[in-house]
Amino acid sequence: MSSIPDYAEQLRTADLRVTRPRVAVLEAVNAHPHADTETIFGAVRFALPDVSRQAVYDVLHALTAAGLVRKIQPSGSVARYESRVGDNHHHIVCRSCGVIADVDCAVGEAPCLTASDHNGFLLDEAEVIYWGLCPDCSISDTSRSHP
């Protein structure tokens, strides 16, 4: 049985004021993993019809800065957001349809990869994006190439 996230408590723990837009954005990001801003805005607007687009952008920025939401932006793609934060995972992106899936780190602890030379930086994260074809697109691609 999965537990229902306590968004108000998450906000308080991050020293953020609990507001309806913040709770609605957390709910939307949790319900729509890897969603773009438009999808999140639509979900929030459904729950709070009077919320502005700018308010959603501002909340996403605040939640990302507080570490409650993670922003990812694969090359050539719009920014997307997820609620899976603070763990050791990366992403797989379909080159054809753009779908994104989580993939756990294969080896080690965060940051998951060890740079051969960190150039004096204190490393705390490695962002890895795998690219390929999702199962649906690979089936379509195979069926097109083999009549």
From Swiss-Prot:
Subunit note: Homodimer.
SUPFAM superfamilies: Winged helix' DNA-binding domain (SSF46785)
PANTHER family (UniProt xref): TRANSCRIPTIONAL REGULATOR FURA (PTHR33202:SF18), ZINC UPTAKE REGULATION PROTEIN (PTHR33202)
InterPro entries, per the entry: FUR, Fur_C, WH-like_DNA-bd_sf, WH_DNA-bd_sf
Classification via Gene3D superfamilies: 3.30.1490.190, Winged helix-like DNA-binding domain superfamily/Winged helix DNA-binding domain
Protein name per UniProt: Transcriptional regulator FurA
Biological role stated in the UniProt entry: Represses transcription of the catalase-peroxidase gene katG and its own transcription by binding to the promoter region in a redox-dependent manner.
Alphabetical UniProt keywords: Cytoplasm, DNA-binding, Iron, Metal-binding, Repressor, Transcription, Transcription regulation, Zinc
Residues holding Fe cation: D87, H89, E109
GO cellular component: cytoplasm
Binding site for Zn(2+): H34, E82, H91, C94, C97, D102
Compartments (UniProt record): Cytoplasm
Gene Ontology terms, MF aspect: DNA-binding transcription factor activity; transcription cis-regulatory region binding; zinc ion binding
Region feature Dimerization, mapped onto this chain: 86-147
GO biological process, one term: response to iron ion
Region (DNA-binding): 1-85
Family per record: Belongs to the Fur family.
Conditions for induction: Negatively autoregulated.
Domain of life: Bacteria
